[in-house]
Amino acid sequence: MGSGEGVRRGSVPATGERRRGPAPRAAPPLDPELGAALAANGSRAPEPLTPANLADRQRRDAARRPRPTVEELGADGRFEVAELRVPGPPDGPEVTLVSARPAGLAGRPLPLLYYMHGGGLVMGNAWSVLPRILREWVLPLELAVISVEYRLAPRTQYPGPLEDCYAGLVWAAGHAGVLGIDADRIVIGGKSAGAGLAAALALLVRDRGGAGPRPLGQLLLSPMLDDRGSTFSGHRPAGHDVWDPASNETVWKAALGDRYGAADLPPYAAPARATDLSRLPAAYVEVGSAEVLRDEGVAYANAIWQAGGRAELHVWPGACHGFDSLAPRAALTRDARDARTRWLRRLLAPPRA
C-alpha cells in the first residue's frame, strides 16, 4: 500500500507464506457507553467465525437480518424506492440495485451515494442498511442512494463481488439521466467489508479508465483492507471486540480461496496491497481505537497522503467495530455520525458560481 519502503517491508514473502504478525498487545479500553452496551448483550464478544461454523452462521444471519421491501422503505411517502436488475459482469448474473431518493425532487439531478453493505464478504444484504442511510443522509443532504446486492463468499470468491459492484456503478453512471443523479457527484462507500469493496472499487475505476464513472469521494467506515493480519491491532487479544482476528482470517480465506496470502494477490482483492494510491477520490476513513481493523485503516489514510491524495481520518477513542450499531445513542456514535455527514456535505456541495 502506498509507495513507501514501509509498505514493501510488509508484503507477503515470495514463498506465499503469510508473515507472522506481532505478538498480541493490550487493547485500548472501551468507551464506557460501548462497554455497557456489550455487557447488556450478555457477553464481551460473539463467538468467532470459523470455517467449521461459517455455513451455519450464514444461514442464521440470512434468517434474522432485516430485509425491508421496497413498499416498506417507501411507506411513509418521503422516499421514492425502486429495485433494479441491471447487467452484471461478463459471464456473471444480473446485479440487483436498490435505489432510493427523497420524494418530490424529480426536477433536479441529485448527488449519489453508491453503497456496499458490510458482513465480512460472507453475510449481509443490500436492503438492511437502507433505513439508516435514508434517515441519516438521504433526507438531510438531499441525495440519492444505491445499495448493491453483491454475491457473497465462499460461493462467489474474488473477483466476483467486486465485479458485481463495478458493473452496477458503471450502469448507474451511464443511466444518470434516467435515475435523476449527477454523475459528477458520486461517492462510493461502505462499512467494514463494504468499505473494503469501496476502496477496491476506487482503485479499479481509476485503473480501467476510459469513459467510465469518476467517483468524487470514497466513504470508508472501518474498512476491511488487508488479508495478511500483520498489524498490531490485528493481533489484539480476543474478547474485546465484536470482530476478532479469528473471524477476520476466516472471512478472508472464504473470500480469496486458494489465493489467500499469495504474494501476487492483486490490490483489488485487498487494497492494503496497493503500491500506488495516487489519483484516487477524496477519502473519509474511520476506525475505532479498540478494533481489529484500526491499524490497516490508519495506514491506508497515511498512504493516500503520501501519494499526494486527500483523506480525512478519524480514530474514535474507545470504539470497537460496529460501535454505532451496538450503541446508536452513545455520544461517540453521535460524534461519528456528525463527522460523516459534515464530510459528505462539504464534498457534495455544488460548486459556487
Where are these regions (language model features)?
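Short amphipathic alpha-helix adjacent to the substrate-entry channel of hydrolases
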Residues: W127-I146
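Short beta-strand/loop motif that positions the catalytic acidic residue
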Residues: V285-V287
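Alpha/beta-hydrolase active-site loop
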Residues: T156-A176, R340
